[in-house]
Regions:
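Short alpha-helix
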Residues: 183-201, 207
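Class I SAM-dependent methyltransferase SAM/SAH-binding core
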Residues: 52-98
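A C-terminal cap/extension of S-adenosyl-L-methionine-dependent methyltransferases
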Residues: 206-260
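A short glycine-rich, Lys/Arg-flanked "PGG" loop and its adjoining helix->strand segment in the class I
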Residues: 126-138
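Conserved class I S-adenosyl-L-methionine
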Residues: 1-40, 42-51, 58, 143-170
Length: 260
């Protein structure tokens, strides 16, 4: 995995985690994740692409044992400064090296939030899913939040800017996305692609849109000063979240896969 996000590490929380849009999208993920955790016997969790550790800390505070990994040493350093929870361990790990860093460990759940897996090629994603199966306990689960190809917000945004070449950019491979000054090669995957890649080892349990009405984070400057509009969009999002078919049109989607 080439993208390290070292440059983005220092400013990531300010540019996404603590923003209005970032908080709303994260709370949507937590609402679904909380239900998954309550319905299953979960003790040990592996997080992939943990970034600055926001989700790992939240999970650890729910009394789960969490191993949180990221390829970026600077992201891991930022995360480690946030907490000293005994049931949380941060490690620098390249996702493409799995399962080598965990030769004797099994996890009940593997979690990856907000498009970390979009830094993989389709081939790498398929290999990750195969490797993840070997790291999970019997009936273990993958909970992944991924960016799809057909995000309506993005298409409308580029249409409004008359940037017609970018309207369907998510359908291309290795799209260069700027993340806080760092150019990251990004690939987008619709739910059907993920379920197909995972079909040998997993069955789908849950599929939900994340950010169908709530916009992408790069629109934060526009929406930050319009709290009433954000409130309306949030209410609409709660309705949209009931309809899995909207997932490929949202900014992200949450997919839960259970090991066969």
């Amino acid at each position: 995995m080439n993208a390290s996000f070292d440059i983005a590490a220092a400013n990531y929380d300010n540019s996404f985690t603590h923003t209005v849009i970032g908080k709303l999208q994260r709370n949507l993920v937590y609402r679904h994740l909380r239900g998954i955790l309550e319905e299953n016997r979960i003790q040990n969790i592996l997080e992939i692409n943990c970034g600055t550790g926001e989700d790992a800390i939240w999970l650890a505070k729910q009394n789960y044992t969490v191993t949180a990994t990221d390829i970026s040493p600077l992201m891991v350093a930022v995360a480690e400064k946030k907490t000293n929870l005994e049931n949380l361990n941060f490690r620098q790990v390249d996702i493409n090296r799995l399962p080598q860093p965990f030769p004797d460990e099994k996890f009940d759940l593997i979690f990856s939030n907000f498009g970390g897996l979009n830094c993989l090629t389709k081939t790498e994603l398929g290999q990750f899913l195969k490797n993840a199966s070997g790291l999970l306990t019997q009936n273990g689960q993958l909970v992944l939040v991924i960016m799809p190809k057909n995000t309506l917000w993005e298409q409308l945004y580029f249409l409004a800017k008359a940037d017609f070449k970018s309207v369907f950019r998510r359908k291309k491979e290795n799209v260069v996305a700027n993340v806080d000054g760092e150019n990251i090669k990004t690939n987008y995957f619709n739910p059907k692609e993920v379920t197909h890649l995972a079909s040998a080892d997993f069955r789908i349990r849950l599929l939900k849109p994340i950010g169908f009405f709530i916009p992408p984070s790069y629109l934060e400057p526009f929406f930050r000063s319009r709290p009433k509009l954000v409130s309306v969009l949030h209410s609409l999002e709660n309705t949209a979240g009931k309809h899995s078919f909207l997932s490929k049109y949202a900014d992200h989607y949450l997919i839960t896969l259970q090991k066969k």
